[in-house]
Amino acid sequence: PRGPLRPLCRPINATLAAZBZACPVCITFTTSICAGYCPSMVRVLPAALPPVPZPVCTYRZLRFASIRLPGCPPGVBPMVSFPVALSCHCGPCRLSSSBCGPGRAZPLACBRSPRPGL
């Protein structure tokens, strides 16, 4: 049997960016995020029932890690926390921990020139 054309929901490594308006440097770092295909059902006939939310690839288990932005002035917290995916599943989107919009062709990027971090 043929598998799906797109990889199923799983943790993958991704390079993200962290910056703060008050700090002069943007850092790029690598973490694991949830990404991939989630099977969904589409109603063939219009129904009187409300639409069923489509499942998204989201965190099942995660931990948080932190990095320090260099060069922040006194009084500005230089620490930035980010999620690290330990496992993923297809489920409802939780806006508290996930970006539920359409996938991006480009990763999140810095507004200023990035400096490699972790």
Curated annotation (Swiss-Prot):
Promotes spermatogenesis and ovulation by stimulating the testes and ovaries to synthesize steroids. GO terms for molecular function: hormone activity. It comes from Balaenoptera acutorostrata. It holds the Pfam family Cys_knot. InterPro entries: Cystine-knot_cytokine, Glyco_hormone_CN, Gonadotropin_bsu, Gonadotropin_bsu_CS. GO terms for cellular component: cytoplasm; extracellular space. The gene is LHB. Heterodimer of a common alpha chain and a unique beta chain which confers biological specificity to thyrotropin, lutropin, follitropin and gonadotropin. One of its GO terms (biological process) is G protein-coupled receptor signaling pathway. This is Lutropin subunit beta. It is found in: Secreted. Glycans are attached at N13. The lineage of its organism: Eukaryota, Metazoa, Chordata, Craniata, Vertebrata. Disulfide bonds join C9-C57, C23-C72, C26-C110, C34-C88, C38-C90, C93-C100.
